[in-house]
Amino acid sequence: MDALQLLTWSLILYLFASLASLFLLGLDRLAIKLSSITSLVGGVIGIISEITQLHAGVTLVAHFATPFDFADLTLRMDSLSAFMVLVISLLVVVCSLYSLTYMREYEGKGAAAMGFFMNLFIASMVALLVMDNAFWFIVLFEMMSLSSWFLVIARQDKTSINAGMLYFFIAHAGSVLIMIAFLLMGRESGSLDFASFRTLSLSPGLASAVFLLAFFGFGAKAGMMPLHSWLPRAHPAAPSHASALMSGVMVKIGIFGILKVAMDLLAQTGLPLWWGILVMAIGAISALLGVLYALAEQDIKRLLAWSTVENVGIILLAVGVAMVGLSLHDPLLTVVGLLGALFHLLNHALFKGLLFLGAGAIISRLHTHDMEKMGALAKRMPWTAAACLIGCLAISALPPLNGFISEWYTWQSLFSLSRVEAVALQLAGPIAMVMLAVTGGLAVMCFVKMYGITFCGAPRSTHAEEAQEVPNTMIVAMLLLAALCVLIALSASWLAPKIMHIAHAFTDTPPVTVASGIALVPGTFHTRVTPSLLLLLLLAMPLLPGLYWLWCRSRRAAFRRTGDAWACGYSWENAMAPSGNGVMQPLRVVFSALFRLRQQLDPTLRLNKGLAHVTARAQSTEPFWDERVIRPIVSATQRLAKEIQHLQSGDFRLYCLYVVAALVVLLIAIAV
């Protein structure tokens, strides 16, 4: 049994779990167990399938005829699709284990229906990655969008429904762009099979039009700026294990689509240099603005969602370097760029999945998303705190964890641009490096804020004081992802050549010899630190703060006196502790043009409180893009809809007239 057949069994299990959940409506507890266990087994089979495929290193193709010539079912598993399915399967296994007990809070609230849409969502993502026909690709893409949309609106409250509608609009706008791109290629090739697209040699203008349509269409799904507005609204609205899958792997379908079109389907045409520069520019902007908006958030899941925009930007930055390398026929740039992109794609799926599961554990105990109402959870939820600490260190790209490794390779790809003689790239490279450096510093600040406000200090609410650790299956799921973050970092010298082999196979570039270790000199892979020495350094570095603390403690006087913290003559209250808003305030001032700040005035003055109630702080910071672009578009659409509504008179005869008029217009258009 080959890898494609194994994957078919995995898909069958997902579909079985989906349909079984549908038939178990009203039996939520049984539906949760059946759905979770079946999808877990499907994920394990998917992992085995893709490891087998990547080890074999061959491309598998299966073709099934249908009654429609344009919709023949063709499956193709190459190195990139196998890698992507492996990433999805890893996260599916962990999220399925997590959902066994997490979904109990949704009993009686449509848990069986959520199981149906969750497994349909997973199946559509996996099948889409191996689909080699444009018609079925779009069908599965729509199925993925619709099933995830139902997960977003699962709570059926006003916030989730509004988030779902915005997601629905942007997702389908992206689908239309992708559809037009495929139809343009289909018109030139006479077929909707991707195999025929690969043989096309399009004119530069048409190729650029196809690329731009596909780039912004898939970019909407990836959550890149300026098509990101749905992401910080939709991901927090979904159940936490669904948020982990949406943020960890669904947005990567957008990255996969960009790679597929630009570096596979249009490879025969050739890539203009400006394509790669455009992708780099949007990636750098997404990374920097994404982390800035993450810093401004109080909602823990919105913070993580904005961080996804940042990490998608980092991945696109590396993808842009790979595209530049392909356009310049530079194997080193191409392969190192793809190495950084794919490595970070894998790492982000792991640590972002971990953090969303951790956020779900906290919310299930405290029943709030507001970090200002948390605090001191490290004492009450120690396992969750430990797992989230590893996730925060990893996403901050601090050694010795996996985020550091993949961002290091992204840095290497940017350093390698110095070898290129093109003036535009010699300017773009340093600018991108500066933006990535600022992004990295802000990311550390962001997750210090998140961990400190959430897990440290004093409890800021009754729920925080009474919080308890989550059930064992949720803990094990989080610890598995935390262990993978550490394991991948320690095995980077073994894993990097495997990912480079995927890059070679996907781009059909000559092999680039890279010895074990991590390059330290820009543009070359000859001067290195040995893996054993690097591992020793990475393991020793985190111990230095602890050793310094022990040294300082030994120098303190033996006699100590403890008392309340000084609070300017007032009695100490937990609300006086540093807040997330206080951490962000300097950046809000420096980058005030990027935020819309609101100040609410309270006309009531209380003599005993002085001026304490004159002003109330804004509970949220709204990005300028939402205020100046998205909101006007939504308002204009609503006004247009009200005008069109006048056509809905309720007169059946008038409706028949509309049909006849539309038919006449179409006949005239065809005749002309």
Regions found by a protein language model. Give the residues of each.
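Hydrophobic alpha-helical membrane-insertion segments
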Residues: 37-51, 172-180, 388-400, 477-500, ...
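Hydrophobic transmembrane alpha-helices and their helix-loop junctions in integral membrane proteins
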Residues: 94-137, 147-469
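Membrane-interfacial helical/loop segments at transmembrane boundaries in membrane proteins
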Residues: 60-69, 195-199, 332, 409-423, ...
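Transmembrane helix-loop-helix hairpins at membrane boundaries of multipass inner-membrane proteins
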Residues: 2-8, 19-116, 188-201, 501, ...
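Hydrophobic alpha-helical transmembrane segments
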Residues: 74-89, 204-218, 349, 424-440, ...
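Alpha-helical transmembrane segments
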Residues: 18-22, 450, 543-553, 666-671
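N-terminal signal-anchor/start-transfer transmembrane helix
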Residues: 9-27, 219, 223, 287
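Aromatic-capped, Gly/Pro-kinked transmembrane alpha-helices
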Residues: 495-539, 550-672
